[in-house]
């Protein structure tokens, strides 16, 4: 019973987990944060940058192909959201712009991101569906469990793909090694026969 209660508490803690970072951005530089995200997942975030007169910070969210999912210029404090189309690595970049005549100052950037189950407002769902607090918690745990199962399925699929790739690579390496050995044996045989004919022509051997 105690173990079951511990697992429930752990799942509830995971359900409320989010990713928060704070970093310093030097003048006229950019810093990008990357993360692998599953397909059809909602990503939400909040950002805040320290204000320095005359300095500008832009942000952009994009995929590995360069498709822009969210973008805003001259940011100070705000929110953003986008939906991932396919499973791949997505990045959020913050870009500092300082005029040439101005001496740049390092700025602080804070970012809080949520994705998937973390983006749902279970309090609002509970009020709309007239659910009891315990039912809301169970709904949250159900969604979290489904998310964990999907993550494991995806990890298993990627493991199988990597294993298939390794097996194909090993097969190709083995084939290439056998082919190389056959070529070397053929070349050595040809050299022996050629030298034998040459020495016979010179009457150095019978």
Swiss-Prot record:
<feature type="topological domain" description="Cytoplasmic">
    <location>
        <begin position="194"/>
        <end position="206"/>
    </location>
</feature>
<dbReference type="GO" id="GO:0009953">
    <property type="term" value="P:dorsal/ventral pattern formation"/>
</dbReference>
<dbReference type="InterPro" id="IPR015720">
    <property type="entry name" value="Emp24-like"/>
</dbReference>
<comment type="function">
    <text>Eca and bai are essential, though not redundant, for dorsoventral patterning of the embryo. Specifically required during early embryogenesis for the activity of maternal tkv, while the zygotic tkv is not affected.</text>
</comment>
<dbReference type="GO" id="GO:0016020">
    <property type="term" value="C:membrane"/>
</dbReference>
<dbReference type="InterPro" id="IPR009038">
    <property type="entry name" value="GOLD_dom"/>
</dbReference>
<keyword id="KW-0732">Signal</keyword>
<keyword id="KW-0812">Transmembrane</keyword>
<keyword id="KW-0217">Developmental protein</keyword>
<keyword id="KW-0472">Membrane</keyword>
<comment type="similarity">
    <text>Belongs to the EMP24/GP25L family.</text>
</comment>
<dbReference type="GO" id="GO:0005737">
    <property type="term" value="C:cytoplasm"/>
</dbReference>
<feature type="transmembrane region" description="Helical">
    <location>
        <begin position="173"/>
        <end position="193"/>
    </location>
</feature>
<dbReference type="Pfam" id="PF01105">
    <property type="entry name" value="EMP24_GP25L"/>
</dbReference>
<feature type="domain" description="GOLD">
    <location>
        <begin position="30"/>
        <end position="140"/>
    </location>
</feature>
<feature type="signal peptide">
    <location>
        <begin position="1"/>
        <end position="20"/>
    </location>
</feature>
<keyword id="KW-1133">Transmembrane helix</keyword>
<dbReference type="GO" id="GO:0006888">
    <property type="term" value="P:endoplasmic reticulum to Golgi vesicle-mediated transport"/>
</dbReference>
<protein>
    <recommendedName>
        <fullName>Transmembrane emp24 domain-containing protein bai</fullName>
    </recommendedName>
</protein>
<feature type="topological domain" description="Lumenal">
    <location>
        <begin position="21"/>
        <end position="172"/>
    </location>
</feature>
<dbReference type="GO" id="GO:0038024">
    <property type="term" value="F:cargo receptor activity"/>
</dbReference>
